[in-house]
Amino acid sequence: MEEESSSWFIPKVLVLSVILSLVIVKGMSLLWWRPRKIEEHFSKQGIRGPPYHFFIGNVKELVGMMLKASSHPMPFSHNILPRVLSFYHHWRKIYGATFLVWFGPTFRLTVADPDLIREIFSKSEFYEKNEAHPLVKQLEGDGLLSLKGEKWAHHRKIISPTFHMENLKLLVPVVLKSVTDMVDKWSDKLSENGEVEVDVYEWFQILTEDVISRTAFGSSYEDGRAVFRLQAQQMLLCAEAFQKVFIPGYRFFPTRGNLKSWKLDKEIRKSLLKLIERRRQNAIDGEGEECKEPAAKDLLGLMIQAKNVTVQDIVEECKSFFFAGKQTTSNLLTWTTILLSMHPEWQAKARDEVLRVCGSRDVPTKDHVVKLKTLSMILNESLRLYPPIVATIRRAKSDVKLGGYKIPCGTELLIPIIAVHHDQAIWGNDVNEFNPARFADGVPRAAKHPVGFIPFGLGVRTCIGQNLAILQAKLTLAVMIQRFTFHLAPTYQHAPTVLMLLYPQHGAPITFRRLTNHED
C-alpha cells in the first residue's frame, strides 16, 4: 500500500515541479529578461531612459517626483510642466525628449517630436488607443473613449449628429438657461459692496453637469440628471482609489470606498436601463419632446433609434459622455477664468468685444458666438497653457518604423501634450506667457508647426465633443463678462494638478464684482 501511494506521489511532485519551473521561467522572462532586451533594442538606436528595476520599473521614482511636485502650491506662473508632468520634465533633461520609461514591466516611449506625433495620429492602421486602466474605464465607461475598430466607427457615426454645428446652435438656449441660472445665484449672494467670492471650479462642475444632462438625455433630462449625480459620487470614489493604483489588486479589495463604488455602479446601470426603456416606450407611443420641431438631437434618442446598438452600449456611452463632457468643459472654464483674473488687460479686451457684439443687456445668441473672436483667442491660449488632458498614449499594433526608429509590437507611446504646448521651439520665447494674440490669425498660424496645438487630440480620434465644449465656454464667459469684473480671491493657491485631467488642487476661489452702469 505504501509503495502504491509513493508511486503516485512522485509523479505529482514532478508535475508540480515542472509547473513551478515554467511559472518561474515565465516570470523571469516577463520581469527581467524581456525588459533587458527592450532596453538593449532601444539603446542601439540612441534611446535611453532611467534603468529598469525588477518588477516595479521606475514607478518608485516616478510617484516620488509627482508627489513632491504636488506637495505645495507654485508661484503665479504658467510654466506648469515641471509640476504636472514632473517625471517627464526631470528625465527629459537627462535623456532628451525621446526616452524609455517603465511602469512596472510595461515600457513606454515618450514622443514629443511633432513630426513623429503627426505620424502616430495619422496612421491608425499601425497605432491604436491604449487600453485604459480598469479604474479609468469604470469612470469613463466602455464607450467611444475606449472602443476600437468597427464598433468605435459605428458608435461615432451614430453619435456625431449630436455635435454637428447646426444641432449645437439649437442647444444655445439650453446652455444660456443653465448659465443665467448660475450667475443669477451669484448675484443673489452679492454683499453690500457688490462683491461675492465663488469657487468657480465647483460651480462650473454643476453647470456643465446640467448642460451635459440636457444634451445627453433631452426630454428625459430630469431622470438623466439623477443618474449623473450617482456618477458624480462614483467619480469621487474612483479618484480616491486611483491614488492607490500602484497597489496590485487594490480595486478588488472590499474597502469601504470600493464597496460603495460597486453599489453605485449597480444603481447607475439599473437607473439607466429604466430610463432607456421608458424613452423607448415614449417613442413607440409617439410622446415626448422628440416629436416637436425643431428640437436638438440628443445622445440617448440617437442611440435608441440606431441599429446594432445594445442597451449595454447605451449605458456605457452615457457614462463616457458624462465623464468627458463634464470634466473637459468645466476645467476649460475654470482655467480660463483664472487666466482672465490674472490678466485683467485681456479680461477688459474680452469685455469690450462682448459689449460691442452682444450689448450690455442682451443675452448672447447663436449669431453672436461666431463674432466673439477675442474670446476664441483667449480660449485657445487657455487650452495651450492648461490642456485638460496633459498626455495621451498610443500602442503599436505591430512592429513598425516611426521616423527612423524601429518600434516593437506592443510598445506604448506616451505623447506629452503639455510638453508640446510648452515647447519654446514651437511657440517662441514667450511660450510660458499668456498671450492670446498669438492666435489672432487662427490656430494654423499660431505655432511654428501644425501639430504644435493638440488639446483635443489629432486624426480620426479627435475629440467628438470639442465644438460643444467651446460653445458652452464662449456663452458662459460672455454672460459672466457682461455682468461682472473678477479677480483672484486672496485665498487662491496656484496648484495645477493631474488626476486623469488637469485641475486646480485647492479649488479656484474668484472674487466677482457687479459691473456698474458707469463701467458699462
From Swiss-Prot:
Subcellular location: Membrane
Name by which UniProt lists this protein: Cytochrome P450 734A1
Taxonomic lineage from the root: Eukaryota, Viridiplantae, Streptophyta, Embryophyta, Tracheophyta
Signal sequence region: none
Function: Cytochrome P450 involved in brassinosteroids (BRs) inactivation and regulation of BRs homeostasis. Inactivates the BRs castasterone (CS) and brassinolide (BL) through carbon 26 hydroxylation. Acts in association with CYP72C1 to inactivate BRs and modulate photomorphogenesis.
Gene3D superfamilies xref list: Cytochrome P450 (1.10.630.10)
GO terms of molecular function: heme binding; iron ion binding; oxidoreductase activity, acting on paired donors, with incorporation or reduction of molecular oxygen; steroid hydroxylase activity
Assigned EC number: 1.14.-.-
Knockout consequences: No visible phenotype under normal growth condition, but reduced responsiveness of hypocotyls to light and increased responsiveness to brassinolide (BL).
Cofactors named for this entry: heme
GO BP annotation list: brassinosteroid homeostasis; brassinosteroid metabolic process; response to brassinosteroid
Induction: By brassinolide (BL), auxin and dark treatment.
Family that this chain belongs to: Belongs to the cytochrome P450 family.
Membrane topology: Single-pass membrane protein
Primary localization: membrane
Gene Ontology terms: cellular component: membrane
Note: Plants overexpressing CYP734A1 exhibit severe dwarfism.
Pfam family, one: p450
CDD domains per the UniProt record, alphabetical: CYP734 (cd20639)
Transmembrane parts of this sequence: 13-33
Positions of heme binding: 463
Entry keywords, A to Z: Growth regulation, Heme, Iron, Membrane, Metal-binding, Monooxygenase, Oxidoreductase, Transmembrane, Transmembrane helix
Enzyme class, broadest EC rank: oxidoreductase
Gene name per UniProt: CYP734A1
